[in-house]
Amino acid sequence: MVSASNPPLLSQTKGQFDPARQNATPVKINKEYLMINTFKTAAISAVLALGMASTAVAQELRFFTIGTGGTAYTYYPIGGVIANAISKPPGSRECGDGGSCGVEGLIASAVSSRGSVDNVNAIISGLRDSGFAQSDVAYWAYTGTGTMEGSEPATDLRTIAALFEEHIHLVAMADSGINSVADLAGKRVSLDEPGSGTYVDALLIMEANGLAIDDLTPEALKGNAASEALRNGKIDAFFVVTGYPTGSLVELASAADIKLVPIDGDAAATLTEKYGFFSSSEIPEGTYEGVAGVDTVAVGAQWFTSAKADEELIYNITKALWNDESRKLLDVGHAKGQAITLDTALAGVGVPLHAGAERFYREAGVLK
């Protein structure tokens, strides 16, 4: 049973991972870096239309941020869909009358960020109300193990829901001669920024294949910047951990002859055996135009908040996430939205549930 008092433990031993010690120190977050995205949409428009005509209405208004990732990756649009689904600004029409079916008085917004590590740190520091993170990054942060060994455990981190699988993409030009992770030796490879879950997993994958960061020339590029650098010959390959299909790779595949490099064999088996949050999976052929499918490994994308967040608020947010109207928005809002289901809401959860989320899942019969 997953609960704040009885958190499940993954097959993780403290101190097993060494090459990523440079990522053990929490990322210092520059507030000016954050970009509140355009997904405030109809919710904010409705409030502006009201003109905040009365003090009573103004007092009912509450904002709630969701840290996502780079704008070219899956976290960002999914965050926008969820923000819309859980929002219901003061003065909105009732749900049954065709209005929003979110939380009364709430305006949620998706926030672009560096990714998983950045979001976890922002939640713990109070900079963001919630955020998405890879299951491995969150577990290590919560326990102070793995890549977070030496950091103070983020014991206030709490889970709202498991969302979808994220697949590790290793991308190279089709004629690059890079056919395996081992072929990255001596190459220029983008590992994403140190504040991202991709960076963490890239180091783990290289370690499993006998490579250290000193065996290649690392770069720290995200999304479209990595794609452009690959097209222009400035890098030889790049990693990205994201739900497929992701926008930056859809665009890249339509403009250039690329390949996905498999992450498989003994190295993949070692990863899935050593770390319980990794699973063997595949990126199917046809996901990206003209690109063959490959075997790879995957991790879970999950939604987190702080234990300090109001129980009633998180209960209502969780309830709104899983109502019928939210289901419709998820199904049409993004290809990965269909994978976000109540049946898998607790899949792979290694950080305790927030008390408000736990209450909803018990009422819904998901937790017994």
Feature map (PLM): residue ranges:
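An extracytoplasmic/periplasmic, membrane-proximal ligand-sensing/linker region
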Residues: 10, 19, 221, 225, ...
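Bacterial N-terminal signal peptides that target proteins for export
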Residues: 33-44
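Bacterial N-terminal signal peptides
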Residues: 45-51
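Sec/Tat signal peptide C-region and signal peptidase I cleavage site
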Residues: 54-58
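Bilobed "Venus flytrap"/periplasmic-binding protein-like clamshell domains
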Residues: 63-98, 162, 166-232, 327, ...
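Extracytoplasmic small-molecule ligand-binding "clamshell" domains
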Residues: 77, 81, 90-123, 290-291
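Pocket-lining segment of extracytoplasmic ligand-binding domains
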Residues: 135-137, 145-146, 176, 212-304, ...
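A structural signal for short loop-to-beta-strand junctions that line the ligand-binding cleft
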Residues: 149-163, 286-295
